Amino acid sequence: MSSGAWVLGLGLALALGAVGARAQEVLRKQYDDGSIYEGTFKDGRQDGTGTYKLPNGFEYTGDWVAGEIVGTGKATYPNGSFYVGQFAKGKPDGIGKMTFSDGSTYDGTWIDGAMTGQGQSTYASGASYTGGFVAGKHDGQGVMTDPDGTVYDGAWLDGVKEGQGKMTYADGTLYQGSFKAGAPDGMGKLSMPDGVVYDGQWQAGQINGQGTLTKAKGDTYVGAFENGQRAGKGKLTYANGDIYEGFFAADERNGAGTFIAKDGTRYAGVWVAGHMEGAGQMTYADGSVYAGTFLADEPHGRGKMTYADGSTYEGAWVAGQMAGLGKAVYGKDQTYQGQLAAGKPEGMGRMVQADGFVYEGQWQAGLRQGQGRATYADGSVYTGQFAAGLRDGKGTLTTTTGFGYVGDWKAGVIDGQGIATYPGGEVYEGAFVGGEREGQGKLTYSADQISEGIWQKGRLLTPNPAANGD
């Protein structure tokens, strides 16, 4: 008799030659390849029940029909895996359970030696799956539970998540929507335990495309996303009522956009990395309007501010303050043109007031300080030093009345040494205190009339012995 031929794997096909034994008689037969069959035969072929062993460790015990493994039995494989269940044509077929060498199991439907149909699998990793299979892979509807508590309930194709499904993560995060190649892809909704919700397009497991993101505190963004971040055009509505509509990049406001605060403040212009930067226009809550360039959310560079009261400033800005060269118009009363720092005149500048007052010279912290020239409404002109906005130091005053003075000043008043010329032609040279002749001085009325001596509150108290005309 010839030896039998065996094919191993998930399926077995056995064809043994006739043995010439009586049907249903239990016989033991060893073949040339070392395999052994012990069981019943019929018409010279294995039939009924029997056990077949191969030298490599394979063993089958169960039903046989006309030389084939058909019916119910148990197969143990060389790698330690074993199958208990139904067979057809030498292969698992019908209902059965396979326990693999690594401890994984499959319990369910088999077709032609492959896991196909409904079944349940447990894996060495601790994961489990219940649902459809095709050719040993998850296919159709099924539920996968991972060791960390993550659960997927939905469609599968060729072993991967594909189609509509629901993914529940261990922390309570829930995704419901479309899957492709095992990851969220297409339209889907993600709900997180902290209240964050995204509803929109996905690609390869990432938020990509158009969608709506609602933050836990109520902020809502509707627009474009790229790899989980806001990118492209969108509208962000804050819980407090503020609104931004424009472009984003890397999850920040970037490019052209308009921000409107609930208090009425409005900015329309360029943004960089979430900040106002570049050309734009800001309308403030009080009605003031700035048009120009920005940096770090502040006016910076060149720009014009029109205030609610009608005042304007046009010129250079630094970090939100007027700084550099510019022109400021304060209501209808005065105009300043020149240098500024920290929002105030600083350096050289010219101030013109509606009443005719003009000052041109040095400034410090918004006050006249240093050398300058002031022309007053009555036509008087002062040229000299200033301090804290007042004439202070050396200076010359000329008036339309004929009075003139050259000398020292203190806190806006003639004080110190100087020469005063009066409308009548008199000339006083000497000391002053508080605008009056005080101390040593000489008053010349004419070439031959001089009053010289000690003065007090404008009057000569003690004439010098050599004085004439007193």
Protein language model regions, located:
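Bacterial N-terminal signal peptides
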Residues: V7-G17
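Conserved anchor residues at repeat-unit boundaries in beta-strand-based tandem repeats, strongest
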Residues: I36-Q46, E59-V70, F82-P92, T105-T116, ...
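Signal peptide processing junction and immediate N-terminal pro/mature segment
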Residues: A18-R22
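N-terminal segments that cap or nucleate solenoid repeat domains
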Residues: A23-E59, G469
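Terminal, low-structured helical/coil segments at or just beyond the last alpha-helical repeat
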Residues: S446, S451-D470
